[in-house]
């Protein structure tokens, strides 16, 4: 028996895959699962979550391919299996295009490191938002500065 939310999740996942793989009219952004999706959708971008891709790949029996590819690339077996599989599935050509890469330092920072590695290989830009752990006024001020520097280099006067 399927619950209504399962159908909504499936429909959303299929629509997202269609946008990522067949519609290049909107920029695709690779993000970690903890990045605020409201920022991505609000800017008219289409998000891709490498960890989610690895989970879907596992459901399709593709994890061995992803893990073998990541091992061949030198990724340590000590890393998170989702991220190792994601690195391998990307290398094998199973992941969609990316127009930009962004991540947060919130909770899991391995995906941010994976994306930074991809950016290094591709020679493009990367934004890492350093999310404070405590929700107080000084943390909010810090995060506002981080957003300005990371997302608006012209406004901050800092070029990357």
Language-model region placement:
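An N-terminal assembly and electron-transfer interface module characteristic of large anaerobic redox
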Residues: 1-160
């Amino acid at each position: 028996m399927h619950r209504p939310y399962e159908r909504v999740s499936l429909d959303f996942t299929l629509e997202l895959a269609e946008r990522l793989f067949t519609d290049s009219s909107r920029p695709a952004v690779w993000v970690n699962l903890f990045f605020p999706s409201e920022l991505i959708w609000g800017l008219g971008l289409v998000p891709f979550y490498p960890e989610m891709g690895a989970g879907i790949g596992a459901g399709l029996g593709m994890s061995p391919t992803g893990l073998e590819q990541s091992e061949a690339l030198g990724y340590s077996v000590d890393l998170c299996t989702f991220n190792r599989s994601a690195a391998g599935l990307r290398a094998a050509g199973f992941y969609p295009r990316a127009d930009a890469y962004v991540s947060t330092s919130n909770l899991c920072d391995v995906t941010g490191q994976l994306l930074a590695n991809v950016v290094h290989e591709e020679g493009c830009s990367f934004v890492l938002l350093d999310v404070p752990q405590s929700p107080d006024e000084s943390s909010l001020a810090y995060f506002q500065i981080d957003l300005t520097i990371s997302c608006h280099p012209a406004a901050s006067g800092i070029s990357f």
